[in-house]
Amino acid sequence: MSYDMNDRHLITFDKDDKVALYTEDLKVWYGQNEAIHGVDLEFEKNCITALIGPSGSGKSTYLRSLNRMNDGISGTNVTGKIMYKDVDVNRKDIDVYEMRKRIGMVFQRPNPFSKSIYENITFALKRHGERDKQKLDEIVESSLKQAALWEQVKDNLHKSALALSGGQQQRLCIARAIAMKPDILLLDEPASALDPISTGTVEETLVNLKENYTIIIVTHN
């Protein structure tokens, strides 16, 4: 499914059964510039939804609003509702860090930590209190398998993630997000910096992931 950010009509589903997240009259300002003009949109569970449109149409701004990544940009103001499990994510009293465990993000360019492959997966888990080595090992293996990377790295888990290819790094970033057990994955043009073969691998990975996750992706193509 795709949604053109130049189209303002409402796309709806039965919220009780199918909708993972929706926005109502979502507007985003950067200072005096209104970048998003009141978008109403619903995202179906276990579906890949693509936000498409030309550069500057607000795709990434909208996507980053869904888990409050725009909060860190000075002068940004977001109004309207972002509803996830009957809770407005845009409320100021929301625990943003806990929310981002449920609504994960993968960015345009691969951004692995300058740590080992293993530590890339476990870093956030440890910060949230997980210390059981066996459980961490299981999560690392499961996450890397879901991201179609396990077979390529299972013998090199303690080597630097920076030694991986661009496509492998992006799949590692997907695995890192999966490790937090999110319901929703947001991806901002995740293959734009990759070669065609790596792009195909990432796309195939996302198709397989939609069985367990709701995927919202920004793309030019």
Say what each PLM segment does:
Residues 81-88, 133-155, 207:
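Conserved ABC ATPase "signature" region
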Residues 174:
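Hydrophobic anchor residue at the start of the ABC signature
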Residues 196-197:
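Helix N-cap at the start of a conserved alpha-helix in ABC-type nucleotide-binding domains
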